Amino acid sequence: FNCLTGFYKPTTGQMYLHQAENKVSLRKYTDFKIAHVAKVARTFQNIRLFPAMSVLENLLVAQHNDLMVASGYSLYGLLNLKSYREKEQLAVNKAKYWLDIIGLTHRADDNAGDLPYGDQRKLEIVRAMCIEPKLLCLDEPAAGLNPKESAELNKLLKFIKIEKKTGILLIEHDMSVVMGISDHVVVLN
């Protein structure tokens, strides 16, 4: 999991992500390049939101790489050029779309740290979805959730899998979540 997302670099061997249009060697990219080039996103076992930033800002942070390119690495943004403003508006629209999907539009301006735990989990997942990944890696997304929140998580993951056609690689102990979304299950002892 950590090698796949670039958190650790393998010492030997190769890792490829096969997509219909090309074969991407993950070993040659840094973690942020894996997200940008190979379209692999992840969440961590422990929530890694920016608690003092707003819910909306947390989703915009995920789109930082695209906005930096659109801004000419800050020049166009500083000059407030139309091309940058348009890209920025697209990023805001994408963030609002995902907030609507998880029912948090009304909390867009609240600090992410003020959300209930289950909502923070969903926010972290849709933050990863803001880069439009081909593969979403989730490390125990249901950890600490009650049964109602786990059911909401399953609904979100099914939407991501079916409607967004995003592959999901899941590490999880909650078997209702695993069996609710999985096509293939591998168990490690």
Per-range role (PLM):
Residues 5:
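Helix-to-loop junction immediately C-terminal to a conserved catalytic motif
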Residues 9, 22-47, 82-89:
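ABC ATPase NBD coupling module
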Residues 40, 156-170, 174, 180, ...:
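Conserved catalytic loops of ABC-family nucleotide-binding domains
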Residues 71-107, 155-159:
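Conserved ABC ATPase "signature" region
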Residues 125:
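Hydrophobic anchor residue at the start of the ABC signature
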Residues 132:
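Conserved catalytic motifs of ABC-family nucleotide-binding domains
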Residues 136-140:
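Catalytic Walker B motif of ABC-type/P-loop ATPase nucleotide-binding domains
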